[in-house]
Swiss-Prot record:
NCBIfam families: PRK05658.1, RpoD_Cterm, sigma70-ECF
Chain residue ranges for the region called Sigma-70 factor domain-4: 561-614
Name recorded for this polypeptide: RNA polymerase sigma factor RpoD
HAMAP family for this protein: Sigma70_RpoD_SigA
Recorded superkingdom: Bacteria
Signal peptide: none
Region of interest: Sigma-70 factor domain-2: 392-462
Length: 641
């Protein structure tokens, strides 16, 4: 166990003793302050269990304290987060908050109008969310469209190239479900061992645990999906038989086998937490068919109104009826105004509509009226679930504010921190398991922290650093500050590595990564010379002025010296040494240019070089001698030759 872990445990122990010695209670804010940022849900559960065993009540912060947010503190936080200096406000403006256009003030004002939830309220809302989910699953399982999707997903899951497990289910929810079912089998020894795990690799362990969970539960999910696919096959066969035996589709409400299979399907699907994309895939298909059906019925209603049929009369005869040839014959005998004329003059249109409605019934496996009732039930359950989630979220927005304020001045504006925290809060609502016996804020705190810290890691830095590396950087920085207070001097990487039980190379690497980038436009000095940091950085690719002058002078001198030779000799030397050209040439290449042998070119080159070695010519080039390679286009190559 590291010193950091011991420090965290000591904080919890001291908080527990303090609560026992006083009034036997502690607030959630006290626990949140004692827990480090990287605390996992399981560790929070263990801490809450310790307080529960010690019979210490865990209370919300004072409602007045939760609602009351000091104007000065909020103004300061807003200045910090937006980097905007506000002018002092008049007293009348401070008193009249209702007319302010400050988005933070308006947000806090609306947020303060929602009452805090008790434990009983949270359980009641969680049950509403759970009931809405159950209703949705039961409705989906009655649809042959969903049955076809279940079968397809099973086939894709077996073929790993088509679908991964994480694309089908919500791994986190399934992992939490497995933890809940196996929670009773855990003992205190295993809990103690888990508390002693090193937190240096929290994020990496989470990634590994997710992959490990995916591998572990894959056989179970495949087996369950196989069973679901088999049940769906049985239900679809019975539905098909119903079509064959009767002239049209019908609901098998009186079939015991059908109802038993349906109940079994609902039970199996309830055990699998499909991710939102898969559920949306089924719902979007059903809603598309429902919209198409509504458009057809609306067009039929408008046509009926043209023949003098009132809206109420149309609904009385249409709603609840099976629209087929028998209905058409029945309505021809209807003595109410307009019906006989409509069915006679628009006979082709009516026949086409009956055929289209029949196609929808075959596609959905349900009568049109039953399909519409099913869609209405699904939409109602969705509305109830969304309203319950909304109630839970709005009542816990104060928690987001209290956590977001701790992360000010880390690269994101205050409103952005609130927004990211709210996203984490919404995830917490989806994952909340009220049966574990703890308050919602326990789980929400972890999810909000995670959302905010990840947003800071992803968005605050100019150069993005992975989240797990950000966590390691923060851990090293905290340890470095702690050791500075203990030792009185900046700790070395070796001392930090020893304290964290981490390889020294990794500490050096992390400390190097932690350096912030600096803008080249940063002003340098306090004067008015407008100097910037970029002006003092050497350009390795730029030519120094002295070198440029030497090269220019060398070219001029070389040109004058070569001009003292014959044109042929000058041309041969330029081609052989690449002077004024992109590259040098071989004897064979020069010979081809002059249409002579390579031996003749060698003789001309030797004669020209002997002329250049004459003191009258050579003394002009001696001052330019360099160690450059032959053929790099440098005229001083002539002297080396």
């Amino acid at each position: 166990m590291t010193n950091t872990d011991n420090n965290n445990l000591n904080k919890i122990d001291s908080l527990l003793k303090k609560a026992k010695s006083k009034k036997g209670s502690v607030t959630y804010n006290d626990i949140n302050r004692a827990l480090p940022d990287g605390t996992s849900v399981e560790e929070i559960d263990k801490v809450m269990f310790r307080f529960s065993e010690a019979e210490v009540d865990i209370l919300d912060t004072n409602e007045d304290d939760a609602i009351k947010i000091d104007d000065m503190e909020m103004e300061e936080g807003f200045k910090i987060s937006t980097n905007i200096d506000h002018e002092p406000e008049d007293e009348t403006e401070e008193e009249n908050i209702g007319t302010t256009d400050d988005p933070v003030r308006l947000y806090l004002k609306d947020m303060g109008g929602v009452d805090l939830l008790t434990r009983e309220n949270e359980v009641e809302i969680a049950k509403r969310i759970e009931e809405g989910r159950k209703t949705l699953i039961a409705a989906l399982c009655r649809s042959p469209i969903a049955m076809d999707k279940f079968r397809k997903w099973y086939a894709d899951l077996v073929n790993e190239n088509n679908m991964l497990l994480r694309d089908l289910i919500d791994l986190e929810s399934n992992m939490m479900h497995d933890d809940e079912t196996s929670e009773s089998e855990d003992d205190h020894n295993s809990d103690h061992e888990e508390e002693e795990q090193d937190h240096d690799h929290d994020h990496e362990e989470n990634i590994l645990s997710m992959s490990k969970v995916e591998t572990q539960i894959l056989p179970n999910i495949i087996e369950r999906m196989k069973k679901i696919a088999f049940i769906c096959e049985e239900l679809l066969i019975e539905t098909k038989k119903s079509f064959e035996k009767s002239a049209g589709p019908k609901i098998l409400q009186n079939s015991k086998k059908y109802n038993d299979n349906l109940e079994l399907l609902i039970s199996e699907v309830s055990e699998i937490h499909f991710n939102s994309k898969r559920t949306e895939e089924i719902l979007s298909e059903m809603y598309r068919i429902n919209r198409d059906l509504i458009n057809k019925e609306t067009a039929f209603l408008k046509l009926a109104e043209k023949y003098g049929i009132t809206r109420q009369n149309f609904l009385d005869e249409y709603i609840g009826a099976v629209i087929n040839a028998a209905w058409k014959e029945k309505m021809l005998k209807n003595k109410k105004a307009g019906w006989k004329e409509l069915l006679t003059k628009e006979s082709d249109y009516i026949d086409q509509m009956i055929a289209e409605l029949s196609a929808i019934e075959i596609n959905t496996g349900l009568l049109v009226n039953d399909f519409k009732k099913l869609v209405n039930a699904i939409q109602k359950s969705e509305r109830q679930t969304l309203q319950a989630k909304k109630d839970m979220i709005e009542a816990n927005l104060r928690l987001v504010i209290s956590i977001a304020k701790k992360y000010a001045n880390r690269g994101l504006q205050f409103l952005d921190l609130i927004q990211e925290g709210n996203i984490g809060l919404m995830k917490a609502v989806d994952k909340f398991e009220y049966r574990r016996g703890y308050k919602f804020s326990t789980y929400a705190t972890w999810w909000i922290r995670q959302a905010i810290t990840r947003a800071i890691a992803d968005q605050a830095r100019t150069i993005r650093i992975p989240v797990h590396m950000i966590e390691t950087i923060n851990k090293i920085i905290r340890t470095s500050r702690q050791m500075l207070n203990e030792l009185g001097y900046e700790p070395t990487p070796a001392e930090i590595a020893a304290r964290l039980s981490m390889p020294i190379d990794k500490v050096r690497k992390v400390m190097k990564i932690a350096k912030e980038p600096i803008s080249l436009e940063n002003p340098v000095g306090d004067g008015d010379d407008n100097s910037y940091l970029g002006d003092f950085i050497e350009d390795k690719n730029a030519v120094a002025p002295i070198d440029a002058a030497i090269q220019s002078n060398l070219r001029e001198v070389t040109t004058r010296v070569l001009a003292t030779l014959t044109p042929r000799e000058e041309r041969v030397l330029r081609m052989r040494f690449g002077i004024g050209m992109n590259t040098d040439h071989t004897l064979e290449e020069v010979g081809q240019q002059f249409k002579v042998t390579r031996e003749r070119i060698r003789q001309i080159e030797s004669k020209a070089l002997r002329k250049l070695q004459h003191p009258i010519r050579s003394k002009k080039l001696n001052s330019f001698r360099s160690g450059g390679k032959r053929g790099d286009g440098n005229p001083s190559d002539l002297l080396e030759a």
